[in-house]
Each structure stands twice: as structure tokens, then as C-alpha cells.
């Protein structure tokens, strides 16, 4: 084996042995037959299936308009966050089916699914959505109740005497 004489030799040796598999993957657009991007999002016990396509900004959740399904403005704000971050409000028609959990968990699941669908439709948005944390699955779920306790951590009342 030949010994390397300088840093330049070392750099040349490193560039010759680099493999194209180690380079960052190129993200491509993923669309179905109707030209829609599809993704699933999860939060707590809720699972949302999200389809997006270019349009005028209509959002349908389980066959109902978003204003009637998510009546609280806070939940609609959670839903719109990914679109506002990437400046794509009113540019996509969004269809969602969501089940499980409560309304807050469902709104978080829709946000997660919508963020993933946006990256499938426009791969260049991935870095800005990832920076905001919208592509990361929130792992927090309800802690189970333990036997010998009133709740997950709360003990029964203790009487010393």
C-alpha cells in the first residue's frame, strides 16, 4: 500500500472512494392517477388520510366542510399552519378522512398528513416544513393506567391512621 504524502493526496483518495449511494436522496413528486398527492398523518390515536390537488382552497373533512367539522378556530389554525409556512394558502383543494381520537388529535393528524402530502407534491418544500417540525410524528400518547393506582400516576388517597 502506498503512503499518502500530503493532504492533497488524502483528499484525492477520499473523492475516488466516495460512492454515489452515500449522497443525499433526490426527492421526486409522488402523484396518483388523478394527479393528487396522498399521505397519512398520525397524532395520539387519530389517523388522517389526506389528498391534495391544485385548486382554490376548499377543505373537506369526512365529507363535511372544515368549518363545520372543526368548529373551534384553534383547530382550523392548526390545520392551516403548513400551508401558511410555505405560502400556499388557497392553492390546493384538500380532502381528508380522519378517524380515532378526539378533535385536537385529529387536527394534529391532519396537519401531519397535509405536511407530508405537500412534500410529495412539491419536494422542494421539505426543508422548510421539516425545520418547523411538521414532518415529525409526535410520539406522545396517553400513559396507561397501572393497577394499584387510581390513574396512570395518581395513587389512591393514603391515610396514615
Curated annotation (Swiss-Prot):
Belongs to the universal ribosomal protein uS9 family. One of its GO terms (molecular function) is structural constituent of ribosome. PANTHER family: RIBOSOMAL PROTEIN S9 (PTHR21569), SMALL RIBOSOMAL SUBUNIT PROTEIN US9M (PTHR21569:SF1). GO terms for biological process: translation. GO terms for cellular component: cytosolic small ribosomal subunit. The keyword Transmembrane helix does not apply. It comes from Methylorubrum extorquens (strain PA1). It comes from the Bacteria. Gene3D superfamilies: 3.30.230.10. This is Small ribosomal subunit protein uS9. Residues 1-25 are annotated as: Disordered. Residues 1-21 have a biased composition (Polar residues). Keywords: Ribonucleoprotein, Ribosomal protein. Pfam families: Ribosomal_S9.
